[in-house]
From Swiss-Prot:
Name listed for the protein in its UniProt record: Large ribosomal subunit protein bL28
Similarity-based family: Belongs to the bacterial ribosomal protein bL28 family.
Keyword Ribosomal protein belongs to the record: yes
InterPro entries: Ribosomal_bL28, Ribosomal_bL28/bL31-like_sf, Ribosomal_bL28_bact-type, Ribosomal_bL28_sf
Organism expressing this protein natively: Rhizobium leguminosarum bv. trifolii (strain WSM2304)
């Protein structure tokens, strides 16, 4: 399991710890990842995703998982999230035609 957010693509960065004497030692900056269950309104299902805390705030800000995925570009999404996005697009298109 890699340390990458499934919704934003946020991953591990590397850098230096810098002491007061300006000594540098390598370190890793890890993303704040959480296992969360998000509900898709269009598909009426729950999905368990590994997302960063910042992505979770963005999902809430945009109005839920469906709205976030529809607005997100496919390049930053994981393969699971891309598949989920395509299913949501298909379901909303079917609902628009039926209405």
């Amino acid at each position: 399991m890699s340390r990458v957010c499934e919704l934003t693509g946020k991953a591990v960065l590397t850098g230096n710890n810098v002491s007061h004497a300006n000594n540098k030692t390598k370190r890793r900056f890890l993303p704040n990842l959480c296992q969360v269950t998000l509900i898709s309104d269009a598909l009426n299902q729950r999905y368990r995703l590994r997302v960063s805390a910042a992505a979770l705030r963005s999902v809430e800000h945009r109005g839920g998982l469906d709205a976030f995925l529809l607005k997100a570009s496919e390049t930053e999404l994981s393969m699971r999230a891309r598949l989920l996005r395509r299913q949501i697009v298909k379901k909303t298109a079917e609902a628009a035609v039926a209405a």
